[in-house]
């Protein structure tokens, strides 16, 4: 269904342990285990948290010493994210309502665009990728995760995760919007983005007390993470580009 009103209806539950929206926070350890190796040094960077929701990832980014701008369509979720940031002394985070397809920022505004649990909800993915490339500085990094459109992802993500395991609210996903890696790679390449290696991520049941966690795996047929570097002229010495290019060698 891809019902995005869910994020307004359930906004107050973003930071409630055990809620279906807070389950997304359990992905962050695996995400950062991957992305920390790509970025290397976060301190002082300007990051766009695209589709920030209630700020679950924004908080982790601020802890790494970056300045974060969080953008989301859900005003109710943005209110929760802003309130949590103020309550936890995060002066380096600001929030704005906006769409991925028409970002309200100048060209080359960010060192990093972080976009997790978002791409598979977009109705106009090409427009969003064009905007992401536009607001990135030359040599900047696009960090993402999304869901692969495979025969296995439909029953696992929609039937099992939403209806049986309760890992996501019912109606959150539409299998037709899931994205194959080669499709995303083609769009990124069209906008002068150099793609890096991707990794898979899957939920793992620990115990009735601990519940679910997420781990990095080789298999990319369900969830996958990746990154791309906005290409820069050879004469440039932009720091983020240098770190990212080292990772691709």
Give the predicted meaning of each segment.
Residues 146, 166-183:
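Acceptor-substrate binding/catalytic loop of class I
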Residues 126-138:
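A short glycine-rich, Lys/Arg-flanked "PGG" loop and its adjoining helix->strand segment in the class I
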Residues 56-102:
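Class I SAM-dependent methyltransferase SAM/SAH-binding core
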Residues 25-45:
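Conserved alpha-helix/loop element of class I SAM-dependent methyltransferases that forms part
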Residues 143-165:
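Conserved class I S-adenosyl-L-methionine
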Residues 114:
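A conserved beta-strand element that flanks and buttresses the S-adenosyl-L-methionine
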Residues 88, 182, 186-249:
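A C-terminal cap/extension of S-adenosyl-L-methionine-dependent methyltransferases
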Residues 1-16:
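N-terminal, positively charged/glycine-rich alpha-helical extensions of SAM-dependent methyltransferases
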């Amino acid at each position: 269904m891809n019902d995005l009103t869910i994020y307004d209806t359930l906004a107050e539950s973003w930071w409630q342990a055990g809620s279906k929206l807070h389950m997304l926070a359990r992905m962050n350890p695996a995400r950062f285990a991957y992305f920390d190796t790509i970025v290397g040094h976060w301190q002082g960077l300007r990051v766009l948290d695209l589709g920030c929701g209630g700020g679950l990832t924004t908080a982790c980014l601020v802890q790494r010493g970056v300045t974060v701008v969080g953008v989301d369509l859900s005003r109710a979720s943005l209110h929760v994210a802003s309130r949590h940031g103020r309550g936890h002394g995060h002066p380096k985070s600001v929030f704005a309502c906006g769409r991925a397809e028409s970002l309200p920022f100048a060209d080359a505004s960010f060192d990093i665009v972080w976009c997790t649990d978002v791409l598979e909800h977009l109705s106009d993915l090409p427009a969003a990728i064009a905007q992401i490339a536009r607001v990135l500085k030359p040599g900047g990094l696009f960090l993402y995760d999304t869901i692969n459109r495979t025969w296995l992802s439909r029953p696992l993500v929609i039937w099992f995760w939403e209806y049986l395991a309760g890992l996501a609210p019912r109606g959150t996903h539409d299998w037709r919007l899931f994205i194959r890696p080669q499709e995303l790679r083609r769009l990124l390449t069209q906008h002068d983005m150099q793609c890096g290696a991707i990794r898979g991520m899957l939920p793992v049941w620990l115990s009735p007390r601990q519940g679910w966690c997420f781990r990095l795996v080789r298999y990319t047929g369900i969830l996958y993470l990746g990154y791309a570097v906005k290409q820069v002229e050879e004469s440039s010495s932009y720091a983020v580009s240098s770190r990212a290019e080292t990772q691709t060698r």
